[in-house]
Each structure stands twice: as structure tokens, then as C-alpha cells.
Amino acid sequence: MKKELILKALKLRDMGFPSGDIAEELNISVKTALYLTLNGEELLKAGETPKEDSEKLDIFLEWDNVRASSRRLRNISKIICDMLSDVEFDGIVGISSGGVPLATLISDELDKNFSIYVPKKHVHTEKEKTTGFIGQNMSSIVGKDVIIVDDVMTSGNSVKETIKYLKGIANPKKVFVVMDKSGIDEIDGVRIEHLFRTGVVDIKK
């Protein structure tokens, strides 16, 4: 496992970030983030991932050179706008936090209503049961056709949660992500579109 990734996870943990936020920041699954924060020091000492965990694979995606630049993000958003040319919709929902910058740029480019969905993994509460929520401009999407935007889809849990929530107040038509790690094409009848998709190929000698 990449040493740099382990060090980043431990640094975020020490800064007080919960596993969900670490996963979001590093574009890894929540399970991987939890594993790194609990076992990071031992992994660094060992110099490699323990053998018993060698079959548990996750893919680390880093696109800081893109998301750190508003110009580059706008270029990505224009690609998504082109993919949206045959979709009729009224509003855009960005999944917090990674999908918000892109959703903002797309809504500006297409002059569409904009809203934010905050998944439950970002809701810090002591309650055992919690849900995500629409964090901005909810009234603009109620009863409307909407598309959902996120940067990276790892397990699909946040997207599935967002779709389920929005189906109670609106009509989600499609999901657009920059990078898909899940291999999922559809969730609850809603099509998932991606710019890039990753996968693991098992090559046996």
C-alpha cells in the first residue's frame, strides 16, 4: 500500500477528521479509510500491507491537479454539459463535498437551479440513526426533474442514499460522476454516467 496514502490518512485522523471525511478527501472507501486510521502505524512499520489483507483491494485516485484549479474544473464541467445535451431537466444536485464545485459550474453553464445534498456520513451527531439532507435551495428542486453530480463514486452508497432521498421530493433522472470505481451502471432505476471508470484485473501467472 502506498506510504503517502497511509501518511495522509493518519494526518487527517490526527486533525480530527472522521472516517467518512477521510474517505471523501482521499477518494477511497470508508472501510479502507477506517482500516488505515486503525492500522496505519503498523503498516508503516511493516513496510507493506499484511498478507492476510492482500486480497482486499481498493484503488486510490488522486486528481488534486484538476480539482485545485477552477479553470480545469470548468473544462471537466463542460464535458459533462456536453453529455447532458440530450437530457431534459430542471435542476442540479451536487453531492457534498466533492460534487459541489462541479455541480456549481454546470448549473452556471446551463443556467439551471442548483442544490446540495449532504450525505449522512458528513452529518456529525451522537444520534444512532441519522439521515442526509438538502443543504441549500431545496425549494428550487421540489417536484422537479434533477440530475445528480459527484466527483468520485467508490461503493455507490452516497449516490444510492442521494437517489433515495431525492425520490421523496423530486425526480432524479441521471447521475454524472467524473470517476467511477464501483462498476455500477444503474441504481434504483437511475442511470449512472461516468467520464472515467477504473477496475482491477487479476493476472495469474
Swiss-Prot record:
Contains an N-terminal DNA-binding winged helix-turn-helix domain and a C-terminal regulatory domain (or effector binding domain) resembling phosphoribosyltransferase (PRT) domain. Belongs to the purine/pyrimidine phosphoribosyltransferase family. GfcR subfamily. The keyword Transcription regulation applies. Keywords: DNA-binding, Transcription, Transcription regulation. Transmembrane segments: none annotated. It holds the Pfam family Pribosyltran. It comes from the Archaea. One of its GO terms (molecular function) is orotate phosphoribosyltransferase activity. The keyword Lipid biosynthesis does not apply. InterPro entries: GfcR-like (IPR022854), PRibTrfase_dom (IPR000836), PRTase-like (IPR029057). Gene3D superfamilies: 3.40.50.2020. GO terms for biological process: pyrimidine nucleobase biosynthetic process; regulation of gene expression; UMP biosynthetic process. The lineage of its organism: Archaea, Methanobacteriati, Methanobacteriota, Methanomada group, Methanococci. This is Transcriptional regulator GfcR. NCBIfam families: PRK02277.1 (NF002620). Disulfide bonds: none annotated.
